[in-house]
Amino acid sequence: DKCSPSGAICSGFGPPEQCCSGACVPHPILRIFVCQ
């Protein structure tokens, strides 16, 4: 599986490995999660 780059939308409930950085964090303004 390809990982998502920084700033990409990710699932807050998904595995951290979905992001290349290994961190999926809440967006400060939008009510979404993004890769750190």
UniProtKB/Swiss-Prot annotation:
Disulphides: C3-C20, C10-C24, C19-C35
UniProt name for this protein: Trypsin inhibitor 2
One Pfam family in the UniProt entry: Tryp_inh
The family this protein is said to belong to: Belongs to the Mirabilis serine proteinase inhibitor family.
Keyword set includes Protein biosynthesis: no
Domain comment quoted from the record: The presence of a 'disulfide through disulfide knot' structurally defines this protein as a knottin.
GO MF annotation list: serine-type endopeptidase inhibitor activity
Function: Trypsin inhibitor.
Keyword Repeat included in the entry's annotation: no
Site label Reactive bond for trypsin, positions: R31, I32
Domain of life of the organism encoding this protein: Eukaryota
UniProt entry keywords in alphabetical sequence: Disulfide bond, Knottin, Protease inhibitor, Serine protease inhibitor
